[in-house]
Structures are given as structure tokens and as C-alpha cells.
Amino acid sequence: MRTILLFCLALGSASVSAQETGMHRVQRIFEAGRDGYYTYRIASLVSTARGSLLAFCAARKGTGGDWDPIDIVMRRSTDGGRQWEPMRVLVPGGAKPSDNATPIVDQVTGQVHLLYQTDYARCFYRQSSDDGMTWSEPVDITSVIEGFRSVYPWVVLAPGPGHGIQLRSGRLVVPFWLSDGGQREFGPNHRGHRPSIVVSVYSDDHGRSWRAGAVAVPDNDTTVVPNETSCIELADGRVLFNTRNESPNYRRLLTYSPDGATGWSTPVFADAFFEPICFGSMVRVSQIPDQSKNRILFCNPDSRQDPWKAAKPATPRSAPNRHRVNLTVRMSYDEGRTWPVSKVIDPGVAGYSDLAVTPDGMIHCFYEGGTIEGTGGNHFKNTHMSVVSFDLAWLTDGADRPSRGDKPFRTPAVR
């Protein structure tokens, strides 16, 4: 049986700014306090094989914490983000958290695959064959993650968040983070999310079955609590994991695999990417030969100039969060070796984000913004989640545009 979602069109709160060069549009599509939820967090965004945008997030009750009651909700746009259908509850969490929606677009079958967790203890899989209008019943795939118990005694699991990827081989790849719960930072009644490691999970049959890969980023005195990870396939076929961590270096961790499953390289810190201890997102915009240039984007809060820090001092195993402000998108033309383009898309409070590209070449960033009044500027308690849409001309102040012969970008899978 399939769950049928019925939609009506609804226009979100929108603003289109007149720019000297390029196109730039912002829409608030989730607002704190609406529909019985305290706040909305944890952005996931994909552009489907047909070009629809699907925006998933965590609708949080209580005080918006990780262990409060959480539903997974979704909104859908079929016109490049100009109009958004009403919010639908995709996964009701009940009294427990359901979170970390991680969609993957399958360019071969046209399906959208979705992984998510419930109570940080079980992982489920669903798929849609009609651009998110209907979804299959949940399938429990926790047994796949059990395969990592031989190398790590986890008690907490979570995919993504953000989106997973499809490789040119057709393989689907999703990063997971696992924790042994030892720190108990949420108190005695909840399993902790620290320490943690990052692992890979994959499917070679379009989501019909899933397999455990290998540990991509272990936890040690260098990597320091690696967890939420974004990923991308490079032009040479390697898969890059870009990982949040709590090292006092305040830099992202990068590790590479030849196939997205095993053979992960020793993680290294990326000087180009400031790490405020927050999820950051990646997406490919174009790739030779279908387009004239290779282009990759990365987005996170670049708050390196912000003086705010938590009261506790940094230690080798405990770096305090930096303020989540100054959401910045960067672009690389050489598969991540250098990042010459940088532009702030929100100078205010902004946290988790996810990126997607529609066939018209527009780039879309779905992100958390603002702080609820009376919370002392707490960046974990967002007032809204917005989608900002822009083109290459806006991002580069007119220095870069698609070439005349460029094809709409699609993962060039061969199966």
C-alpha cells in the first residue's frame, strides 16, 4: 500500500531582489510556531529527475531539541521554487524523534529514495516514483547498520542529513554517523550523540537492498567527534565525504574513496572550509563534457570573523561551537582543489543548509535562519527555513554563466 499525498498550490513568503547582475530570489517556506510546531530544522533538498524540488525538514515540538517529538515534513515545488505546495507530514514521529531525512535522486529509474531515522535507533527506507506525490510504505533497514557493530558499539544512528548521491555507476551512496552514546550530553535519560564516527552505506540495485560500506572517518584526537557529512562524486570517479567535526582547528574534514563504500583515505583538514561545528552541504553544478566547465558548490556558515564563542574553553577533545552566522556559498572549478568564488547568501543567523540544481541552471539553497525571540539569540531555535534561488551570474557577479551548448546537468549514470 502506498501513502497518497494530496496537494494544493500555495505561494510562500517571497522576495525577489533586483540585482545588477543575475537572478536572486528568497522564499520562506517554513515558519516557527505554525501548524503546531515550535520550530523547523535540518534541511534536505533535491531536484528530481523531472525537475521538481522536494524540501524535507524536521518539524519539532516541545522546545525544539534533538530528543523532543519530531515529525519529518516536506514541501514540493514543480516550477523551480516559485510556488510551493502545502506542507505534508511524511513521517509522524509521535512522542519520539523522527529526523535526518536523506533523499537520493535516481536518474536511472526516476525514483526518489529516502532514508531517515526514528528515535536515533532505527533506520527506514521509502521511495517515490512520482516526484514525491506518493511514497512507499517504510522498510526497516536497521539490520544493515548492525553490520558496523563488529567495529563500533553504536547506540545512536543517523543518516546524512542533507542529500545522498548517485554515482556514474548507478550506485547510491549515503553517509551515516554513529555514536556509542557515552558522553550523555542530553542528560541521564537520553543517549548521547558523542563521541561518533562516520560510515558509508550504499545500494547497487536502486534501493531494493542496502549494504554497509566501511568506516570513513574514525574518532580520535585528530578528527574529534566526526558526524554529519555531505558527499559528492568527483570527475575522476572518487567519492568525497565532507565532514563536520569538533576539532579546535575549526576546519572541515575531507576523506576520499574510489567507490563510495570502502578504501577511505586518511581524513585531512580543509583550509578552505571554516567549521563552526555545523552541517555543511555540497552539490555539483556542471561537469565536462556535458557542460563547458566543472563546477562544485559548498555552503555553510563561515563565522570565522565572528567573535562569539561558548563559555567553555577549547580543549583537544572539546571545541565550543562558533556562532552560526554568515551563510556562505563557495564554488570550485577544479574539483575542490581551490575555491575562488565566495558569496554570502545570508549575513544573519543561519545554520544547516542543503543545495540543489534544477534543469534551468538555477541553484537552490534550503537553510535554517533566524532565532526565536526570547531565546537569547540561540541559533538552535530558528524562526524560519527559507529557499534562496540564484544563478551563476548572481553568484559570480557576472563573471560566469552557462555556455550556449551546455546540457542540463544530470548524473551521467550508465546502468
Short names for language-model regions:
Residues 1-4:
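Positively charged n-region of N-terminal signal peptides that target proteins for export
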Residues 19-415:
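Asp-box/BNR beta-propeller blade signature and adjacent active/binding-site loops
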Residues 6-7, 414:
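Intrinsically disordered, low-complexity repeat segments enriched in small/polar residues
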Residues 8-17:
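Hydrophobic h-region of N-terminal signal peptides that target proteins for export
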